[in-house]
Amino acid sequence: MVLSVDSNEPSYFGNNLECEIKPLPEGDFWIEIGERRIVVERKTWDDAYNSWMQKRLEEQISRILENHEDYVLLIEGNKQSSRLWRNKQFHQIDSLQKFLNRMSLEAIPVIYTSSKKDTCSYLNYLSKRVEEGKFMHLIRKTTVLKSSRNKYHNIMSMIPGITIDRSKTLY
């Protein structure tokens, strides 16, 4: 597993992550294991707003979507510490939040971290999940029930799209 950091990113990341520093054509971090690559684009709130207003953010997201299969948009910092918030430009930051919500729903997962330290923790966590083969796998825990009939309903409800009520009509 290799974590690569774009050479334009702050030296903080190179000093606090086990990584290679090199120019990356898209994204700010790449997590690679075998043929799989996860691209992480990092933005502070102010940077995200400026990029969004100049339409660069949409272009960056489009390039990542076209060229990679796994990707994340990471927004770093707190809204309250952004220049927009300090200047009481709440409408602009709300508009950006709506755009990010839409992107998260329609195009790219959006992750929020509170600081560079938190970003490093998230990247280490994501790297570990990728390395363990757990990235993009969600496993629901089963509940132990006494009735054998209820046990089958519970097992069936683990299938995506099947609720307990639906499993009762099926079995």
Regions found by a protein language model. Name each.
Residues 1-8:
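Short hydrophobic beta-strand segments
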Residues 10-15:
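Short N-terminal binding/cap micro-motifs at the start of the first secondary-structure element
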Residues 20-158:
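Extended, alpha-helix-rich binding/interface surfaces that flank or overlap catalytic cores
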Residues 170-171:
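C-terminal active-site rim and adjoining tail of enzyme catalytic domains
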